[in-house]
Amino acid sequence: MALQGISVVELSGLAPGPFCAMVLADFGARVVRVDRPGSRYDVSRLGRGKRSLVLDLKQPRGAAVLRRLCKRSDVLLEPFRRGVMEKLQLGPEILQRENPRLIYARLSGFGQSGSFCRLAGHDINYLALSGVLSKIGRSGENPYAPLNLLADFAGGGLMCALGIIMALFDRTRTGKGQVIDANMVEGTAYLSSFLWKTQKLSLWEAPRGQNMLDGGAPFYTTYRTADGEFMAVGAIEPQFYELLIKGLGLKSDELPNQMSMDDWPEMKKKFADVFAEKTKAEWCQIFDGTDACVTPVLTFEEVVHHDHNKERGSFITSEEQDVSPRPAPLLLNTPAIPSFKRDPFIGEHTEEILEEFGFSREEIYQLNSDKIIESNKVKASL
């Protein structure tokens, strides 16, 4: 696998960090997740392919344990606000002095500098500060919070994984690690580069929800079907639009020009009436195999059984019969080989990991006795 041999230490946090580390694990990295004592959940979320160690970083001896781990690791991933790691004597100046090859990835909401860097926030706040939230929503309505995919996972976790991989590549030339300041505000803003670069085009001249790509166009939106399901339409190009009109049983010469924005509301109503006449399955029979850019809106239950996804093996099933997406992208020479085992219990591998990093049995016993670490072998055997 592409990242085979790379050792990652992930400090537990909310979803963006675990996702970032899972991506690295899926592509071959050995990921140790450092969980906090008394964690709320027995099982790590987004823990595929990882091992879990419970360590109290608030105690100086716990911080010393992490320093030993980082001396023999390639990457440290930390999800805290500015100043937290420095307060624990675990800042990049210390850890990279002890291991100059260490890549120190900092994944936060607002970044390591600026007036918001020490403030709390969530996906919707990062979207708001990036400007992207102002573009999301229906005409005449408030901007609405989409699923927390855009800032947390795309602008945060995935962008951080990209930064780590670029830093690993740079290290092959320089021999040195570096600090990565990945944050969800700037990551999301970067994802919106197309919006920024096209602001002066007519593409975005109308208010939110009335433009071609934000639900304003009748040929780029969703429609309810007779059975209460939905079809997604994205027939932008004229040749695809003609196939849409044909599939709907309409005639182009009886409709306004496709790009007549003044007529879009009436056209949407007409299209909605037509889509409401047939079920989702019936519309699939009409549009499947065509270039009309019309597809069913699938639920999580349906997507696994869709022919295209089954043919490509786009979803995988774990030993516990949990279904999740196959890692992407598909590398033909060094594809990801995700773990099919269950996610680890919190602290399941504490002693095993410490032994691998050179801790003696006596040291591990003492750390356990002093509540610096926790080992949950009993839970793991249930």
From Swiss-Prot:
The keyword Acetylation applies. GO terms for cellular component: cytoplasm; cytosol; intracellular membrane-bounded organelle; mitochondrion; peroxisomal matrix; peroxisome; plasma membrane. Its main location: other. GO terms for molecular function: alpha-methylacyl-CoA racemase activity; signaling receptor binding. A motif (Microbody targeting signal) lies at residues 380-382. The keyword NAD does not apply. Monomer. This is Alpha-methylacyl-CoA racemase. It comes from Homo sapiens (Human). The gene is AMACR.
